[in-house]
Structure formats: C-alpha cells, structure tokens
Amino acid sequence: MQDNKMKKMLFSAALAMLITGCAQQTFTVGNKPTAVTPKETITHHFFVSPIGQRKLLMQPKFVGGAENVVKTETQQTFVNALPGFITFGIYTPRETRVYCSQ
C-alpha cells in the first residue's frame, strides 16, 4: 500500500515538473500573411533571470528590415528552464523565433 502511494506521489511530482516552467509570448504586427515556419530561431543566453535586460530579443536584420517582421515568438521551454532550475535562476536561456511576411 505504501509503495503504491509513493509511486503516485513521485509520478505526480514528475508530471508537475514537466508541465510547469514553460512560457510563450507571441507578438503579431499588422495583418500581413505570416510564413508558417520562422525565418530565424535564436537562443538568447541570460544571467540572473534577465534582471536589467539590455539585449533586444527581436533582430529584424534576418528578414530584411523591421517592416518585414510580422510575428515574433519568445518561448522558454522545459529544455530552457532546466538549466535555470539547476543553477537556481542564474543562467536562464530563452528561444526567440522571428517570422517574416510571405
């Protein structure tokens, strides 16, 4: 009986860790049609959970200028959150995807 409770508790804890800590922000500009796949995917490396962030996440040079940027997504996945968890938030990578107009 105790063994079964322990397995359920460990499974619940593992599931909670897998589904938490992920975040995604999407910014859409204008009503232009958007490419299905991103033009560029960039991983930004931040330290101390970007306190005092000075780095720009969107770099329109990949799509030929800011006027061609239609959508930007910033995401912190489980894979990105894992180093932050291990380092207690000192190192926190984040992915950014830039979509251009078709």
Swiss-Prot record:
One Pfam family per UniProt: Lambda_Bor
PROSITE patterns for the chain: PROKAR_LIPOPROTEIN
Keywords associated with the record: Plasmid
Function: Increases serum survival and confers group II surface exclusion.
Protein name: Protein iss
Origin species: Escherichia coli
Gene that encodes it: iss
